[in-house]
Amino acid sequence: AGYIGSHTVRALLQQGHSTTVLDDFSTGHRWATQGQAVIEVDLKDLGALRTALAGTTFDGVFHFAAKSLVAESNREPQLYYQNNVDGTAHLLTVALENGWNRCVLSSTAAVYGNPITDTLGEAHPKNPISVYGQTKLAMEHLLERTCADHPFSAVCLRYFNAAGAASDASLGEAHDPETHLIPTALKAAAGTGKPLTIFGDDYPTADGTCIRDYIHVEDLANAHLHAMNYLA
């Protein structure tokens, strides 16, 4: 029921799929579930998760459930490891118990840390510099091990700076509180938000400041569907 997950639900519905939304609604929004079946449960509570999902059958799991604020992760590392890593371990435990065998993980380019090349590929070293990035890499490792030990397949998508809204304006990003770069930059430029600090002045650009890429959230949602179709 978060930003990227809700747009992925929308994309699934457009292709005729039925969905079940699993969320504890600590940051997600009920209005974003778009009338789909909802299971409200905390991934950190393995017992409650087992009870809520006992006997369920799903063709695949899209895993978006993770805390994602870099600064907060460095202040509260235990919270991020408990939520992101323990939560993923519990989800995979229940998946194996119920016979689900496909997962697409919402990972992050933060697993790379400070890049040593302009273009990031699969072989680029993974050296996250934030606790958030470390927990996402640990989530990837859990999936990798699960795939090695069980008849299970997974894809991890490493992205950053999702932006935009549904093309028909029916769905978009919740901005209270605002935590994402692009809306923050737009508000700063419009004079309706706090000034934005830009770090670095020696990049190979006209004014020496860095250039940030982004991906539209609808393209990102469709990428998740393509990844799941690949696993099928």
Predicted regions and their residues:
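N-terminal Rossmann-like NAD(P)+-binding domain of SDR-like oxidoreductases, especially those catalyzing
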Residues: 1-165
